[in-house]
Structure formats: structure tokens, C-alpha cells
Amino acid sequence: MRTHPDFPNLFILDHPLIQHKLSHMRDRQRSTMGFRQLLKEIALLMGYEITRDLPLTTEAIETPLCTMDAPVIEGKKLAIVPILRAGLIMAEGLLELVPAAREGHIGLYRDHDTKMPVEYLVKLPDPAGRRFILVDPMLATGNSAVHAVDVLNRNGVLDAQIRFMALVAAPEGVRTFHAAHPTVPVFTAGLDSHLNPNAYIVPGLGDAGDRLFGTK
């Protein structure tokens, strides 16, 4: 994992396995099934880093030889919140890593004319004492990510409780996001070159939602 000189609160997960799988996802010939499976695998691998600083507690257990106070994390103190619909598959990967975590949902779609997010669903677990991992494959303009964090704030979640995880990010999106929420760390597998006039990340991987679900 490395940082970026222009974005001090951006963390790029450059593990070889993550980069290898991301390259396969970028390939336009990748099938829907293959694209979906790769995203789930990358999310699980990214989850290892994004949960690195989860606090541990102890639990008394019995091994075959003795009793001990064993270090454990409290999965119920973690909430995974995908931005629908594309974030759902990333959430699946994270839930394999921490199956006891709670799951919320924020439904947004991007207006094709204004490029701004439109909200249609919000379902969240109790925020008290809980860390929230907000997930979306693409951090493009940054507008949806900012809106989603605003939704969490509106429901009692502080910026200090939030981590944002994206498969691929554009510099424009990172700037927009951190202009609004400078203390929320962003974790990504790839910081790409730029946005094109249609607000797609270049080189990117196309429309993640359409490629995940086989729609147009």
C-alpha cells in the first residue's frame, strides 16, 4: 500500500495480486461472470488492508490444551455500505472477510444530463460505535461518493467513522471528494489518468454496473 504526493489521504493498494486481477477486469473482452468474480476477489484482498487498524478485544476460549484470552474483532461493530448497484459485489467480497458485519445500502443513480447523483434508497444500521466502509467500484467525478458520505452524516455517522473504498479512481474525483470530506481516507486499487467528456474514467474499465450485471 502506498500514498500519493498530491493526495495525502489516498491509499493505493498496489499488491501484485490486486494489480493482476484489475488488469484482467480492464480487458473489454472479459465476460460478465469473470468481471463479477474478479471484483469480488479484489474487494476481499482490499478488505485486508482497509481493516488493518480495526480494534481488537479479547475473548476467553478453550484450546485443546488450555484456556486463553484470544484476540478477536467484533464484526458487529463494522458496517459495510455499498452504493447501489455496482457496490453490491464489492460488499460480497468484504462480507466473506468479516461475515458478522452489518450491511447498509445507499441507492444512487447518475443523471446522464447533469452528471449529479439522484438518491432513491437509504437503509443503514445503527451508527453508534460502528465503523462504516462505503464501497463503490468507481470514484469518477466524486459527486456520488460525496453525496453518499453526506447521507451517512445525515444519519448520525461522523466522518471519523468512515472509510471509502473504490476499485478505480480519477484525480478529479479524489479532489472533489476530499474538498468535501478531507479527513475520510480513500482506498483504491488504481489511480487512473483523467475523466473523458462523458465523465468516464480513462483508461478505466467502462461502466462497472453494466459490466457487472450484463446491462446497457
Swiss-Prot record:
Its EC number is 2.4.2.9. One of its GO terms (molecular function) is magnesium ion binding. 5-phospho-alpha-D-ribose 1-diphosphate binds at residues 85, 110, 136-144, 207. Binds 1 Mg(2+) ion per subunit. The magnesium is bound as Mg-PRPP. GO terms for biological process: UMP salvage; uracil salvage. InterPro entries: PRibTrfase_dom, PRTase-like, Upp_B, UPRTase/APRTase, Ura_phspho_trans. Pathway: Pyrimidine metabolism; UMP biosynthesis via salvage pathway; UMP from uracil: step 1/1. Belongs to the UPRTase family. This is Uracil phosphoribosyltransferase. It comes from Rhodospirillum centenum (strain ATCC 51521 / SW). The lineage of its organism: Bacteria, Pseudomonadati, Pseudomonadota, Alphaproteobacteria, Rhodospirillales.
